[in-house]
UniProtKB/Swiss-Prot annotation:
<protein>
    <recommendedName>
        <fullName>Actin-related protein 3</fullName>
    </recommendedName>
</protein>
<dbReference type="GO" id="GO:0031252">
    <property type="term" value="C:cell leading edge"/>
</dbReference>
<dbReference type="InterPro" id="IPR004000">
    <property type="entry name" value="Actin"/>
</dbReference>
<keyword id="KW-0547">Nucleotide-binding</keyword>
<dbReference type="GO" id="GO:0005737">
    <property type="term" value="C:cytoplasm"/>
</dbReference>
<comment type="function">
    <text>Functions as ATP-binding component of the Arp2/3 complex which is involved in regulation of actin polymerization and together with an activating nucleation-promoting factor (NPF) mediates the formation of branched actin networks. Seems to contact the pointed end of the daughter actin filament.</text>
</comment>
<comment type="subunit">
    <text>Component of the Arp2/3 complex.</text>
</comment>
<keyword id="KW-0067">ATP-binding</keyword>
<dbReference type="GO" id="GO:0010631">
    <property type="term" value="P:epithelial cell migration"/>
</dbReference>
<dbReference type="GO" id="GO:0016331">
    <property type="term" value="P:morphogenesis of embryonic epithelium"/>
</dbReference>
<dbReference type="InterPro" id="IPR020902">
    <property type="entry name" value="Actin/actin-like_CS"/>
</dbReference>
<dbReference type="InterPro" id="IPR043129">
    <property type="entry name" value="ATPase_NBD"/>
</dbReference>
<dbReference type="GO" id="GO:0034314">
    <property type="term" value="P:Arp2/3 complex-mediated actin nucleation"/>
</dbReference>
<dbReference type="GO" id="GO:0003779">
    <property type="term" value="F:actin binding"/>
</dbReference>
<keyword id="KW-0009">Actin-binding</keyword>
<dbReference type="GO" id="GO:0007369">
    <property type="term" value="P:gastrulation"/>
</dbReference>
<dbReference type="GO" id="GO:0005524">
    <property type="term" value="F:ATP binding"/>
</dbReference>
Length: 426
């Protein structure tokens, strides 16, 4: 069967989790931790030489002895070393990454790679050399017929189109991508990332979990120590929200606590006895560290709204309004209730204050045009990058712009240094 008749495989490799599935679907078929459990000697940096020695000695079976995803973190892999091939979005161990992709394709997707085109994602500022390594693995190890490497921020912009009118769809915008390990603010102009203006915020989902864990540790002694992180993570996902004003929220809880308090019920994994946790201020203080980072990190005190405003002011002047008008949220850590509303309010205040200052400094001669700040949240926000890839890989034009195996054999891996933004995006 022609590889054009079968849907493309879309794989979004993140620091914490990997999303994989087939093009045309609205959600990934599998979401698994980006972890791989291997035997110690294979996990060493000299893994290729060790594997060669094993094969010569007839012990190459060790090469196949590994787990990925949830299995890598399960008790069954307790005698293995757990490795994370991706750090801050960038692949650091290509040998382990190849084995990880191997099981993604054969065990999870159950696909023959020779029969499917592949769309893989990359973080902003990924190096051209990393694209070449990806191409070598995909074309030489898996013999794929075609490959396209897409920037995650552009796919997140594309995913936001589903909830908007065709006339409102734009490839100029600011993507706030906040996952488990890091938050990126990425400006995109006409489908291309403005690399010099990207900002990294050292606060993400994991930091919120740690912050809630510390708050609970101070007053809740019923939580088993070995379960405190998972309890904090569950509380974050079930009960947390963003409030418009922290001080007023404290007053609300103190005035009528029964209305706002929640209870988390759990089972001690060792004694099997039930325990309960009262969840109060943690509900709104957790996500608040995006807007008041000094709550948890004294070395970083810039609110996310200030970072966004500063970033946009550093971009070329002709795209600034387009960026303010299209701030798109992506990733699980942007899913808190009212996160978009508060972010829009705070960025609007900053931009209005700047316009007011310009008018004052001009003595009233300048009347700046108001800036329309729009923060876009949508149903596909959690898996925005994967969904954007699924949308693009299901178009006929995807097959025309993907790099083919024949191209690779003729020109080498350098062809994948450039992946054009194609018509479906423009």
């Amino acid at each position: 069967m022609s590889s054009h008749q079968l849907p493309a495989c879309v794989i979004d490799n993140g620091t914490g989790y990997t999303k994989l599935g087939y093009a045309g679907n609205t959600e990934p078929q599998f979401i698994i931790p980006s972890a791989i459990a291997v035997k110690d000697k294979v996990a060493s940096s000299n893994a290729q030489a060790l594997r060669w020695n094993n094969r010569v000695g007839g012990a190459g079976i060790d090469d196949l002895d590994f787990f990925i995803g949830d299995e890598a973190l399960s008790p069954a892999a307790s005698n293995y070393t757990v490795k994370y091939p991706i750090r801050h979005g960038i692949v650091e161990d290509w040998d382990l990454m190849e084995r990880y992709w191997e099981q993604c394709i054969f065990k999870y997707l159950r696909a023959e790679p020779e029969d499917h085109f592949f769309l893989l994602t990359e973080p902003p500022l990924n190096t051209p050399e990393n694209r070449e390594y990806t191409a070598e693995i995909m074309f030489e190890s898996f013999n794929v017929p075609g490959l396209y490497i897409a920037v995650q921020a552009v796919l997140a912009l594309t995913a936001s189109w589903q909830s908007r009118e065709a006339s409102d769809r734009s490839l100029t915008g600011l993507v706030i991508d906040s996952g488990d390990g890091v938050t990126h603010c990425i400006p995109v102009a006409d489908g291309y990332v403005i690399g010099s203006c990207i900002k990294h915020i050292p606060i993400a989902g994991r930091d919120i979990t740690y912050f809630i864990q510390n708050l609970l540790r101070e007053r809740e002694h019923t939580i088993p120590a070995e379960q405190s992180y998972e309890v904090a993570k569950t509380i974050k996902e079930k009960f947390c929200y963003v409030c418009p004003d922290v001080m007023k929220e404290f007053v609300k809880y103190d005035t009528d606590s029964s209305k706002w308090l929640r209870t988390y019920d759990g089972i001690n994994s060792i004694t099997k006895r039930p325990f309960s946790v009262d969840v109060g201020y943690e509900r709104f203080l957790g996500p608040e560290i995006f807007f008041h980072p000094e709550f948890c990190n004294p070395d970083f005190t810039t609110p996310i709204s200030d970072t966004i405003d500063t970033l946009i002011q550093q971009c070329p002047i002709d795209v600034r309004r387009g960026l303010y008008e299209n701030i798109v949220l992506s990733g699980g850590s942007t899913m808190f209730k009212d996160f978009a509303r508060k972010l829009q309010r705070d960025v609007k205040r900053l931009s209005d204050a700047r316009l007011q200052m310009s008018e004052t400094l001009s003595g009233g001669r300048l009347k700046p045009k108001p800036i329309d700040v729009q923060v876009i949240s949508h149903k596909m926000q959690r898996y925005a990058v994967w969904f954007g890839g699924s949308m693009l890989a299901s178009t006929s034009e995807f097959y025309q712009v993907s790099h083919s195996k024949a191209e690779y054999m003729e020109k080498g891996p350098s062809i994948c240094r450039y992946n054009p933004v194609f018509g479906a995006l423009t």
